[in-house]
Amino acid sequence: MGVMGGTFDPIHYGHLVAASEVADLFDLDEVVFVPSGQPWQKGRQVSAAEHRYLMTVIATASNPRFSVSRVDIDRGGPTYTKDTLADLHALHPDSELYFTTGADALASIMSWQGWEELFELARFVGVSRPGYELRNEHITSLLGQLAKDALTLVEIPALAISSTDCRQRAEQSRPLWYLMPDGVVQYVSKCRLYCGACDAGARSTTSLAAGNGL
């Protein structure tokens, strides 16, 4: 079972294509998207969890292999990857988990809480934008010798799209069409997300320290 963790603020086609490619590469029956509750490493305020959850539900609704989990949102407190994986193991004890995240996030894996346990809980798939250079050696030099199948790096052309760019485009009233599913574009517009001062009520009140993730 694939696990696509991220802030999804907002979710876009890069996330969806990455999940689809990883599912095909590893012949996964299902990919569960897990919007973070309070991402402990984000340096900016993030949109309210319910907004990010609903955008993810809208974006994944048309693919029967995709589902969305609230485990991180409903747990409360800062979101740590090891807690996400432990909860999903408890819910799906017979499934082997493939945790997918940005390759840039993997580069800072040593800063994650409980990083030693992560590779015992899941196989990791690092997805990267075209031109992003990250070799397995960069990570194994920190973690020691990983098992051969513990980590796979996959280049995803659609990850040239970024949530940061989508937020900036929304703030500047530039079009979001074809960067994310139509329903998400409409949700962003209806809820007036990412439009500067007008979206104060749509933001999380938690300010968090420096970060990573998709």
From Swiss-Prot:
Involved pathway(s): Cofactor biosynthesis; NAD(+) biosynthesis; deamido-NAD(+) from nicotinate D-ribonucleotide: step 1/1
Enzyme class, broadest EC rank: transferase
* GO MF annotations in UniProt: ATP binding; nicotinamide-nucleotide adenylyltransferase activity; nicotinate-nucleotide adenylyltransferase activity
Cited InterPro entries: Cyt_trans-like, NadD/NMNAT, Rossmann-like_a/b/a_fold
GO BP terms, alphabetized = NAD biosynthetic process
The reaction(s) annotated as catalysed by this protein in its Swiss-Prot or TrEMBL entry are: nicotinate beta-D-ribonucleotide + ATP + H(+) = deamido-NAD(+) + diphosphate
The protein's role, per its UniProt record: Catalyzes the reversible adenylation of nicotinate mononucleotide (NaMN) to nicotinic acid adenine dinucleotide (NaAD).
Recorded family membership: Belongs to the NadD family.
Q: PANTHER family recorded for this chain?
A: NICOTINATE-NUCLEOTIDE ADENYLYLTRANSFERASE-RELATED, PHOSPHOPANTETHEINE ADENYLYLTRANSFERASE
Q: What is this protein called?
A: Probable nicotinate-nucleotide adenylyltransferase
